[in-house]
């Protein structure tokens, strides 16, 4: 199978849709056929929509790197609510949009041609990120309310990583991970109200992702978001949760051991 056939089978490209009233006018107006009569291909609108989200995630990563470098050497802490909220939104766009691309593309492909399908796809992504934003705010308010002494923040950060690994062994994590994999693809036709359907799909998927990655996200909040190295490490773990093969119990224990080792390393390096 050639590359073009593989892309066409995946729905990423398709034959250019002809326009006009007669065959000669269509070929002249759109250039859809060469002298041999072979039809040209175009990138499908759902693929362009997914590409736009991927570019947005890349821009968010660039901004995350810039923020981390501009706060180099900052001590672990949450900072003001405004600064935390801004940094958290950017980080969620960088980390979570790529893992949601399969669902975004599937929704766009199924809804293409219906009224306001582009708006509905944007609503899905916005709902997904809004759930993560609310989770981040909840972590912020809970952690700022706890009387954590500054002298033991490095110990708290190490414990957070160890507890994130322990959370990976819980039934809640396992059930959420299975649900997350199930909701990554749509099943059946979309309802008539496309925008409302996008909100429901985005909210359900986000809630399953929160249950799947809550331990790592709490650790990220506690460790502080100014450390680019920890952001990349935890982002890789989350991407593996969502897009990798379903882990066995042995792999779950291995993940716990890795996170415990990272917690010890963080405590020693702090």
Label each residue range with its predicted role.
Residues 253-270:
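Final/C-terminal transmembrane alpha-helix of multipass membrane proteins
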Residues 169-175, 194-225:
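Alpha-helical transmembrane segments of helical membrane proteins, especially in multi-pass transport
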Residues 51-59, 82, 86, 90, ...:
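Lipid-exposed faces of alpha-helical membrane segments in multi-pass integral membrane proteins
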Residues 56, 116-144, 213-248, 256-260:
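A small-residue-rich subset of transmembrane alpha-helices
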Residues 3, 37-39, 84-127:
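Juxtamembrane transmembrane-helix termini in multi-pass membrane transport proteins
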Residues 96-104, 210-216, 228-229:
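Transmembrane helix boundary and interhelical junction motifs in multipass membrane proteins
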Residues 3-13, 22-90, 115, 148-152, ...:
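Histidine-/acidic- and/or cysteine-rich, low-complexity loops and terminal segments associated
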Residues 133-183:
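Transmembrane alpha-helix/helix-exit interface in multi-pass inner-membrane proteins
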């Amino acid at each position: 199978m050639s590359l073009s056939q593989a892309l066409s089978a995946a729905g990423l490209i398709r034959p250019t849709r002809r326009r006009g009233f007669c065959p000669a006018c269509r070929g002249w107006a759109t250039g859809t056929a060469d002298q041999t009569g072979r039809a040209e291909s175009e990138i499908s609108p759902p693929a362009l929509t997914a590409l736009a989200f991927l570019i947005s995630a890349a821009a968010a990563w660039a901004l995350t790197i810039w923020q981390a470098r501009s706060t180099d050497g900052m001590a672990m802490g949450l900072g003001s609510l405004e600064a935390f909220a801004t940094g958290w939104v950017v980080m969620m766009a960088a980390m979570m949009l790529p893992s949601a691309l399969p669902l975004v593309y599937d929704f766009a492909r199924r809804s293409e041609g219906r009224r306001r399908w582009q708006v509905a796809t944007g609503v899905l992504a916005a709902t997904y990120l809004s759930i993560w934003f609310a989770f981040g705010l909840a972590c912020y308010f809970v952690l700022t309310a706890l009387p954590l002494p500054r002298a033991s923040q490095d110990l708290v950060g190490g414990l957070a990583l160890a507890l994130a690994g322990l959370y990976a062994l819980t039934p809640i994590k396992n059930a959420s991970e299975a649900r997350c994999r199930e909701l990554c693809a749509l099943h059946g036709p979309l309802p008539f109200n496309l925008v409302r359907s996008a909100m429901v799909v985005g909210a359900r998927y986000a809630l399953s992702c929160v249950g799947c990655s809550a331990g790592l996200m709490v650790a990220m909040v506690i460790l502080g978001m100014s450390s680019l190295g920890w952001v990349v490490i935890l982002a890789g773990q989350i991407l593996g949760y969502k897009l990798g093969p379903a882990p066995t119990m042995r792999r779950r224990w291995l993940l716990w051991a890795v996170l415990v080792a990272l917690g010890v390393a963080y405590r020693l390096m702090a």
